[in-house]
């Protein structure tokens, strides 16, 4: 935490964008009792089933769920600035997430209150190491470094995909990433 959230809290319920257009409740949030929006979020999760053996590409994060629900309420993912949606102030990334996930670079502004450090506790140790390698290479060599890190980590991701979905899952995922076009092997 860079500074007290008292000023933000005094303005009412809030959420923050992880990146422009993607709201992450894990960055921090405030609510008043019985807010309809949060009832919708809880209801969504109450009616879900979780099967971690499923294809991880089918698993949707809380970021996507919350963002989708906010869009239904009028949230504009392209808007630059603070939006008030369903009685909730949605703050841009500079407020609670000034760290670039891909480079690790932190850009503080006069609006920064907290820094989300992306501990990625849900990932395996090797997945965290692969992401850290991507961050370092992206910072040092730009997008070419990030692509190289992706290539270095690719055998692990293919192995993981095969372990959970079999060879068919690997081919289907590769095809999706290739916009449905035939993949030449």
Task: Identify the role of each PLM range.
Residues 2-185:
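Glycosyltransferase-associated regions of secretory-pathway enzymes
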């Amino acid at each position: 935490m860079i500074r007290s959230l008292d000023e933000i809290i005094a303005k009412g319920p809030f959420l923050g964008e992880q990146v422009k257009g993607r709201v992450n409740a894990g960055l921090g949030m405030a609510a008043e009792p019985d807010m309809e929006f949060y009832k919708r979020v809880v209801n969504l999760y109450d009616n879900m089933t979780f099967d971690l053996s499923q294809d991880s590409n089918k698993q949707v994060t809380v970021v996507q769920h919350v963002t989708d629900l906010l869009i239904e309420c009028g949230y504009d993912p392209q808007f630059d600035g603070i939006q008030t949606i369903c009685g909730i102030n949605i703050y841009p990334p500079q407020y609670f997430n000034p760290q670039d996930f891909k480079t690790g670079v932190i850009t503080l502004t006069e609006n920064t209150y907290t820094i989300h450090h992306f501990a990625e506790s849900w990932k395996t140790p090797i997945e965290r190491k692969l992401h850290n390698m991507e961050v370092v290479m992206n910072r040092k060599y730009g997008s070419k470094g990030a692509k190289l890190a992706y290539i270095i980590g690719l055998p692990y991701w293919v192995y993981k995909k095969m372990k959970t979905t079999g060879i068919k899952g690997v081919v289907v995922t590769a095809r999706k990433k290739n916009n449905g076009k035939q993949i030449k092997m």
